[in-house]
Amino acid sequence: MSDTEENPLEESRESGEMEEEKEEKKEEEEEEEEGEKEKEEEEEEEKGKEEEKEEEKEEGKEEEKKEEEEEKGKKEEEEEEEEEGKGKEEEKEEEKEEEEKEEEKEKEEEEEEEGKGKEEEEEGKEEEEEEKEEEEKEEEKEEEEEEEEEKEEYNPSFEEDALQQSLTEGSLSWEESQEDGEGLEEWVEKEEQREGEEVRGEEESEVRGREEEEGWEEEKSGEEEKSEESERSKERGGEEEGQEKEEAEHEGEREEGREEEEKEKSVEREEEEEEEDTETTETKAGRAKEEKKEKQNKTALVDNIVISHEPPRSSSSLADSPEVSQIYKDNSMKVDDTEEASQKPEDILAQGKDEARLSLEERRKLFQSKGLSAEESLVSVSTEDTLFQKEEDSKVYPLSMTWSFGWNSSLPVYYMREDRRVILYTCAHTAIMYDVVRNTQYHLQGHPNIISCLCVSEDRRWIATADEGPDCLIIIWDSFTGIPVHTIFDSCPEGNGMRSIAITRDSKFLATISDSATQKVCIWKWTLAVETPACTLELPKEYGFQDNLVFNPANNKELVSNSKTQAIYYCWFEDKGILAHSAPVLTEKTFNKLVGKFSQSVFHLKLPQVLSATKEGKLVVWDIHYPSSTSSSAISAFPFIKPRKLVHLQKEAITVLMTIDSYIVTGDIKGNIKFYDHTLSVVNWYSNFKLGAIRTLSFSKTIPSLPTEKSNLPTDCTLRGDLFVVRNFIIGTFDATVYHMTVDGTKLEKLFVEPRDAVYAVSCHPYQPLIAVGSVCGMIKVWDFEKKVYLFSRTFEKGLGVQCLTYNPEGALLGAGFTEGTVYILDAMSLENESPEPFKYSKSSVSHCCFSHDSNYMATADVNFTVAVYMVVVKNGQRVWEYLARLRSHQNSIQSLLFGVHLDSNEPRLLSLGKDRFLIEYNLVKSCKDHLDVLDVHRTDQGNYPTCMIWYPPLTKELFLLICNSGYKVKLFNATTKMCRKTLLGPAYGSPIEHAQVLPVKSTLELQKRYLVFINKDKVGLQILPVDGNPHKTCAIVCHPNGVAGMALSYDGRFAFTAGGQDRSVVQWKINLGALEAAVSLGGEDLTPFYGLVSGGREGKFYRELEDYFYYSQIRSQGIDTMETRQVSEHICLSELPFVMRAIGFYPSEEKIEDMFNEIKFSEYVETGKLIDKINLPDFLKVYLNHRPPFGNTMDGIQNSFNVLGYTNSEGKKAIRREDFLNLLLTKGEHMTEEEMIDCFSTLFGLTPEGWKSEPAATCINGPEICLQKELPEEITAEIFTTEILGLTLSDSSEQLIQ
């Protein structure tokens, strides 16, 4: 054998000798420890014997006490018997004889019981001695087994396995790990001994308790055999004995507690001795090893056991960064001791028992120490697959986003992962992580406004998004988990939000440019979790609107931005807090050539230069001049840029400029993508794919592998003709199309095509999971919303923008209205024309389209207030659509167009609702070619205008039309008489309801529980029917911050869809009715939810005043001056209702008062046939809350009236002349008589103390004398009318008026 083969054996022999010496030392130490253990056990046994003797003495004392108490009881019984039997001597003698006999029996029984107890005690002692002997034998056996294990032969294979394990796990050396293992085994043995002692003590206490219970049961059985009188006496004695025994048991428990405390102290002493021993051994081993261990391994203290472990490696590339580490600094520890726990279950049991003996504070400290060591941040341990492995959130929200159709093509798309082709883009106020392979989306929700800019880190770990609008936010997300790790509030105090955002290559800093008139450049140290920027710079307006910002990849203190006319270079001096900038003016005279408008700017890969692309296909090269160390002038103290040259690259406008690896990449308006080297020489290009104008390019983070024989890479344009190697990339175009380019093989894959213009139209199929989306760009796209699969589409010719869509009840046809007035009837499955030619009878955009229930009629409405009707006729045996008639029936925009059914004839009925407050029904039977007949016209409101109309579901016997208005009210109108039957407070979420639909039901069992889905300006919400004004029956969520354009519901009622208009997206919302019902139940029953709508609640001042006015109205109705007995009831007559309303600050018009009367009078008419002429206080409160203005009386309402009726005076305010003011009161609207007007003013000015004619029993011989020419000023403004005439005050905190 060679030397190389002998070396391992020699090394193993030497190591074996070293181990034998160590084992001998260990045996000596173990023998010394065993001797100490034996001494301690002997001392404990002596203590146990002394304690047993003391217990026997105490038991004897207790028995003597019992006998004395029994004798006392007997004496008391004798005395009682003597007192009771003074007149009966014969009976006493007989009773004494019987008592003597019974006493003899009792003594005999007690002697027998004492004998039995002594025998049982002797048996128990014998059993304890036997158990001790068995335990000693077991301990001897264990010691012998340990000695045999130590004497086992040396196993070199085991040494090699342990060495490999220590190297792979990065833990201690093999010898040290063995020492730690032996220390743990010794600790386990001690813990087992402690457990055995505890178990013995518990068994002894159980035996004692059983003996006491058996004796107690025997005493009870003896008492039952005695006579009735003796039983009574014995029961009293038994109770006293029970009390004494309970006291004895308590004393026993206290003694056991003392014993446990002593055991705990002994355990603590042993642990301290062990710690001292370990410290001595560690000092012998040397402090150098300890320092290395502390650096490499972290320790977790669990029940005084030191377990070393390797800290987990963070998947982030920023784990070593001190700034980023602060984000998850406290959560990056984890004790991976699962293997030790599985190998030593006895340790865990002992640990649990030790914890049970600890005090409350000690347990709390121990729990905290374990929690800190075991916790790990999800951010620190997550991987790239974590995000899409998340389970769906529990159903805690009534509406939750499940899918987003569309893409904001004005913002870039980022390539996040190549293996699953995960891309990042934005829709409205949501950032979306889309897994192309799995066809799944993850939504990053949190912005209140439309996302205006976003960026990602070099390693694709961190995502930064910012929005524009009020309360704008900057949010940094972890792409592995979808968690927002940091949010910057109030980033733009001006409220305009951010225009551009960038992140450094090392992800430590963020830079933003605001979207305000005076732009600000801010640099943020986001990893430090601060809310203020590290540096801020205001840009002059002459620099233009900067909308592109980039960091220098080689230097995170340098930035460049550009507007269409100006490029700016920035240099950040972090220590000085200065952001220096250089913005040289560039004109056509600079190079004597046309430069063009700038598009994007980047830093050069190798040279200190900045490159700016222009819309003329040129590239401006700027040199960066750094100050020399010898320069002393203030001007040259900071770096600056100078234009060096103008390079004409191509004719087409350059829209994208970026760098990747060693290439400079451009994308242009013709769809060409070109690659240049650092000398601006062309290396390769893609121009034969006929793409749209390039909006964004994003390359994979995966570095391309070296080419092989199987590679199908293109050759570059150099003379050598090398293979062109570049990362795969994502292409986004201005026409909202996203592609994936695989360089190996030059494979272009279209990922999706979305509408590039506003989306206003959306409609769901009546019985299939299909949704049709229409865009102003002329595209109609049909999706399967359950499988999230695009099915088919049609793009119409240029100039035809889709404005509205609707399926017919059978789902076979799709009606479409276009922006230029054309109406198409399409086949629902192919989107081909159903009629030979489209209908062109309108010159303006078609806003509404609907079919009748039998699909024989279709009606449309346009923005010129015109309603058109189309019908089916039979020609040559075929059903053909023809135009019937059209009518300009409204004076303002049409809000709703609705088909219904005549209940008596089952014929369709058509209604339209306009912003002019008119509800018009058309007579389709009498209509003919070019003549649309009107059946009736009704005005729906007096001041507010209607916003939408639907059929109310048949929850009652009466058929209603539900109409929402701009005053946040929901009104129910009788479908036949058009009478307003009820006015209710609708959802108030910042803006009134604009569109509503009743949620479809899946079965007939759900017909009695219906729901309403609605949208307002920017939200989608749910409302439980019937509407009653309860604020807990409704909820809403922001769906499109820039405005909702349309809504549709799935056929099964599980999903709602909202179209975002200008944000070019449609969002799918999952409906969870259980969450809404839970909120209602938590809100309370009966009047509890309504009390919350009153200032101060039920116990507040307002409600108390309401009660006073309510009962005072009873006094008024009976006469103020009457001397008859008052009759107080729970109701007031309806005639008193207006006066109470005005008394509490609500001033309804006469029409609103009439609506209130109708609502109350006919509330039970359908069920009982009777009219109601009175109202109680709870119902009055509901009527008041539902009819009053939702936000009270405001100064804005009065000011708007003066803006319409008044003129501008010399001070620039709107005012009304006195004569005009009085004339308006007498002639316009619900005009007054002259007498009514004078009485009103006399009341307002305090000339009628009784309050005008509101007091029916008050007498007034002569009418009030008032001269309005003197009381009223010549010119009345809104402020004068409010404060001086009405006597109202304006709240300081709001514009609400206070009476």
Swiss-Prot record:
Acidic residues bias spans: 17-45, 91-162, 176-189, 212-228, 269-280
Recorded superkingdom: Eukaryota
SMART domains documented for this protein: WD40
Basic and acidic residues: compositionally biased ranges: 190-199, 229-257, 281-297, 331-351
Cellular location(s): Cytoplasm, Cytoskeleton, Cilium axoneme; Cell projection, Cilium, Flagellum
Ranges where the record places region Disordered: 1-351
Assigned keywords, A-Z: Cell projection, Cilium, Coiled coil, Cytoplasm, Cytoskeleton, Flagellum, Repeat, WD repeat
Assigned GO CC terms: cytoplasm; cytoskeleton; sperm flagellum
UniProt-listed GO biological process terms: flagellated sperm motility
Gene3D superfamilies: YVTN repeat-like/Quinoprotein amine dehydrogenase
Ranges: WD repeats: 484-526, 534-574, 585-624, 643-678, 681-741, 745-785, 791-828, 838-874, 881-924, 935-975, 981-1027, 1033-1071, 1109-1149, 1169-1209
Function: Involved in spermatozoa motility. May also regulate cilium motility through its role in the assembly of the axonemal radial spokes.
Protein name per Swiss-Prot or TrEMBL: Cilia- and flagella-associated protein 251
